[in-house]
Amino acid sequence: MNNKEIVAKALHDVLNEELTMDQIEQLLENPKSVDHGDVAFPAFSLAKIYRKAPQQIAAELAEKIDGTNFEKIEVVGPYLNFFMNKEAVSQAVIGEVVKEKNNYGNSTFGNNGNVPIDMSSPNIAKPISMGHLRSTVIGNSIAFILEKIGYQPIRINHLGDWGTQFGKLIVAYKKWGSEEAVRQQPINELLRLYVQFHEEAEEKPELEDEARAWFKKLEEGDQEANELWKWFRSESLKEFDKIYSMLEVEFDSYNGEAFYNDKMDEIVTLLEEKHLLTENQGAEIVDLTEYNLNPALIRKSDGATLYITRDLAAALYRKRTYDFAKSLYVVGNEQSNHFKQLKAVLKELGFDWSDDMEHIPFGLITQGGKKLSTRKGKIVLLEEVLNEAVTLAGNQINEKNPDLANREEVAKQVGVGAVIFHDLKNDRLNNFDFVLDEVVRFEGETGPYVQYTHARAMSILRKANFTPDATQRYALNDKDSWEVVKLLQKFPETVMQAAEKYEPSVIAKHSIHLAQAFNKYYAHVRILDEDAQKEARLALVYAVATVLKEDLRLLGLHAPEEM
């Protein structure tokens, strides 16, 4: 139970059912100053019920409430200020973390419901840029968070592996490419060929016709075209996997656009049967006027299907395959109209499960306030940024701890973790500025700061040779530990809040606040002093290390034990 639940129950016991537990909890406030207690209840809402002044109601309630869980209850005007019993609360919180370990904060809320998460989704034959970072790490973190509250996440990398660009690539490869060059540097070479095609096509527009012809062959199942396409795809995936393994992101499915080639006819047939298709300048559309949306373009005048047709097929496939409780699409803000159309068309088809589909949009990464897309005219490659971050982290670790045994491994965990953490600590919908030197700093609100705090806690536990005992009573009642205990207590509701809002930043901010509170505690309290409270203090350190590690895991970061 958190402090608000404890207070709500105490009030509910004396309020004769006038308000439900939930209603009371909604009214409770966190006082701005510690002088006003840990939880405050404003009695205004009871004035009408009791036909008395709020001040009088507050005073009468204070007399009736069972004070077992409180050090004191103060009446200040119309407010009841509750000061929690630090010993009782700290014993309960530390005891629960010691007992549950990394399962602290787990719940069965999700009831094992499947949740496909459409995330990352780069285009084949193009490099993974910093622009792909957000979808990848936000999706991965949401998956961990949902798993913690009892859902079964399914990470789907909906690859951009189909389209007219493959006709261009085949032409370019046959004219100017070599197998060896593609094998050595798949993405760089395929991108070079793609760029060369566009440069040459300016002088020779007939190349565009050749590309269209090759894409038509590919669509018709031509053996040579199909083998080249498969090869471009598999070589690209090898390159992508290097980056995914750096980020330690694993996917359950790589079903991309091509996977749905044979599944779109059914969608068109369903739309026809429901008489939802209307002709517009030779193209076929679904009118979405009643949803205040532009029409959804299903099929072009040349019979080619469009992106939304593929997404409709994918949505139907995912429902049939996973029977999802919810289905998430972690895709940038600019796609919001597309997803509104997607859900509206499914609704028109009578698929009410479309209500369980959600677009999880996010803002842009910027540099100096401008969209981060190019550096010296080139795409900012994610792999280069991650490698640079690892180097910077390694340099700092060498300065702080040159004798560290597994320096390279820790540098990777800290450097890559720093980039992920910086993304996730920002509210998902906000744009944010990216300056690598600041991201990898060991001070301030950074991933390395939280990781370093965890390593510090582990170092104290090693020095004391401390292992907590779940049968022991670990209680503290000092002011310094209380701030730490309150943040530990808040962790389960933080996880729930992050899950409800699909907002990893809630977890990142909790980790920062807990690290800050613990470092303050470390500075003020002699943890290893031999006295009656030593074991309880060490149990608190253990609880901090456990919860920080879990905070970091939910964000997709490691928690090194030494740094």
Swiss-Prot record:
Catalytic activity: tRNA(Arg) + L-arginine + ATP = L-arginyl-tRNA(Arg) + AMP + diphosphate
Entry similarity comment: Belongs to the class-I aminoacyl-tRNA synthetase family.
Subunit: Monomer.
Subcellular location, principal: cytoplasm
CDD domains in the cross-refs: Anticodon_Ia_Arg, ArgRS_core
NCBIfam families: argS
Coiled-coil region list: none
Molecular function via GO: arginine-tRNA ligase activity; ATP binding
PANTHER family linked: ARGININE--TRNA LIGASE, CYTOPLASMIC, ARGINYL-TRNA SYNTHETASE
GO biological process, one term: arginyl-tRNA aminoacylation
Protein name stated in the entry: Arginine--tRNA ligase
SUPFAM superfamilies documented for this protein: Anticodon-binding domain of a subclass of class I aminoacyl-tRNA synthetases, Arginyl-tRNA synthetase (ArgRS), N-terminal 'additional' domain, Nucleotidylyl transferase
InterPro entries: Arg-tRNA-ligase (IPR001278), Arg-tRNA-synth_N (IPR005148), Arg-tRNA-synth_N_sf (IPR036695), ArgRS_core (IPR035684), DALR_anticod-bd (IPR008909), Rossmann-like_a/b/a_fold (IPR014729), tRNAsynth_Ia_anticodon-bd (IPR009080)
The organism's place on the tree of life at top rank: Bacteria
Motif 'HIGH' region positions after renumbering to this chain: 122-132
Pfam families with a match to the protein in the record: Arg_tRNA_synt_N, DALR_1, tRNA-synt_1d
